[in-house]
Regions:
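Hinge/lid segment of periplasmic solute-binding proteins
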Residues: 34-38, 105-159, 299-301, 377-378
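Long, aromatic- and glycine/proline-rich binding clefts that accommodate carbohydrate-like moieties
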Residues: 358-411, 415
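Extracytoplasmic/periplasmic substrate-recognition and gating elements
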Residues: 63, 68, 72, 148, ...
Length: 447
């Protein structure tokens, strides 16, 4: 009975936003149900991930561990949606992979249902792992609320930046974005390009409003609002501050690619096709644009800021970037828990974390070892991502015990859907913020 209830619970929790740290654009469909088989009987650890861009680098690191341990590692890439479907199937009575990525949307559910290996005893005996050396938000995320135990170690963290196409700016005579830009500057530049590019079908800006982490969450925090409060028990999304941020977003949406166009094509495809001049994206997607045909035309800037103080400069608290972090977790029923933890420990060791950054896989989950990440993409300056945490402010991607309940509701009728599709009316956006306040409060109360 518990497993049937678990299956239903996880099914509800698996409708995940593609915005969340490594969505579908960079994933592969090479995974199958067979890839979920564990070490039992195979003599090797089965590892599941969802981002094909990271496969080569992570397999290289895993092979180094194999040389030390003698245990083989097979990393399987499963596309984002099937990843969670297969993991759910394993959790509900099948066989889960030995080691796999865990995510903020589902972590508490998997931990509370005893599906993940408790790492406390291993960490206590492991001289290579000191949780104080990792980003606090990522550590906290994979710490179970009701018993304080740790069920995953931080794999990485990420930040958000503004990506722009220099060729489009040149064509329409608009100056390039800089780190001094405000959101008003983005709006004004987008308006100029969208107007000038009408005959060519080119837009100045594109945002997928279903993508929150690399999209509209950031502007709310810039203006002083919070999607979820720091204690994970409330929200200020209906406050005057949050409404000011969403009003600025509304003004940008008025001059950006319509959501009907974005829904059909996607922001990344629009950008790589030369049909939009600006998007915001996460550090986990750099490789996609670095390998694109016209990557020489691409450049990154820090996210714009909100000049709330009106003094013409970016003060503390006016430029935020969301950050998130995946966790390396092991199945509670893995046939070889010692080997599974040993691999996780190696992935999260200082040596491997530095290597991960230097290879351009992702920014490290360990603090202070991502210096080489900014130099991993020859010819493309990606320092905007590391400078986001050095010169700006970070907030951890908002989550509660059952994040997907309110995240999904915010995208529907009664949430922000009407505001996304009809950005010309300020009252619609303001009302959506009020609705969102109640949606989130009600969802938290029901958790």
């Amino acid at each position: 009975m518990k497993r049937k209830l678990l299956a239903a619970t996880l099914t509800a929790a698996m409708v995940l936003s593609l915005a969340a740290c490594g969505g579908s654009s960079s994933s592969s469909s090479s995974g199958t149900a067979a890839s979920c088989s564990g070490a039992s009987g195979s003599g090797e650890l089965q590892v599941n991930i969802w981002d094909n861009n990271q496969l080569a680098g992570l397999q290289q690191i895993a092979d180094e561990w194999t040389e030390e341990s003698g245990v083989k590692v097979k990393i399987n890439v499963v596309d984002w949606d099937n990843y969670w479907t297969l993991l759910e199937a394993g959790a509900s009575g099948g066989q889960m992979p030995d080691v796999f990525w865990m995510h903020s949307n589902t972590a508490q559910m998997y931990m509370e249902n005893d599906l993940l290996l408790n790492l406390d005893d291993y960490i206590a005996k492991d001289d290579a792992i000191d949780l104080a050396n990792y980003y606090e938000g990522v550590v906290e995320l994979y710490n179970r609320d009701d018993n304080g135990s740790q069920y995953a170690l931080p794999k990485d963290h990420d930040t958000i930046a503004l990506l722009y196409n220099k060729a489009i700016f040149d064509k329409y005579g608009v100056e390039y974005p800089t780190d001094d830009w405000t959101w008003e500057d983005v709006r004004d530049a987008a308006a100029k390009i969208t107007e000038a590019g009408k005959a060519d079908g080119v837009y100045g800006y594109a945002i997928n409003t279903s993508n929150n982490q690399d999209g509209w969450y950031n502007i709310i925090y810039d203006y002083g609002g919070q999607v979820i409060t720091d204690d994970h028990k409330g929200t200020t999304i209906g406050s005057d501050e949050a409404k000011a941020g969403m009003e600025m977003l509304r003004q940008i949406l008025e001059v950006a690619a319509p959501q009907t166009v974005v829904a059909e094509t996607g922001t990344d495809s629009l950008f790589n096709s030369g049909l939009t001049a600006m998007i915001t994206q996460g550090s986990w997607m750099i490789n996609t644009f670095y390998k694109a045909e016209h990557h020489d035309d691409y450049a990154w800037a820090m996210l714009p800021y909100a000049d709330v103080n009106g003094n013409g400069q970016c003060d503390k608290g006016e430029r935020y970037s969301a950050y998130n972090g995946l966790g390396w977790a092991a199945a509670a029923n893995t046939a070889d828990p010692d080997a599974a933890y040993s691999l996780i420990s190696y992935f999260c060791s200082e040596k491997a974390q530095k290597e991960q950054a230097a290879l351009g896989v992702t920014m490290a989950g360990m603090k202070g070892v991502s210096e080489d990440f900014a130099n991993a993409f020859e010819g493309m300056d990606v320092s905007a991502f590391t400078r986001a945490e050095e010169e700006g402010d970070l907030f951890f991607r908002p989550y509660t015990r059952n994040t997907t309940v309110w995240e999904d509701a915010l995208q529907q009728n009664g949430g922000f859907l009407d505001a996304w599709l009809n950005p010309s009316d300020p009252a619609v956006m303001a009302k959506a913020c009020d609705n969102a306040q109640k949606i989130i409060e009600d969802a938290i109360a029901a958790e």
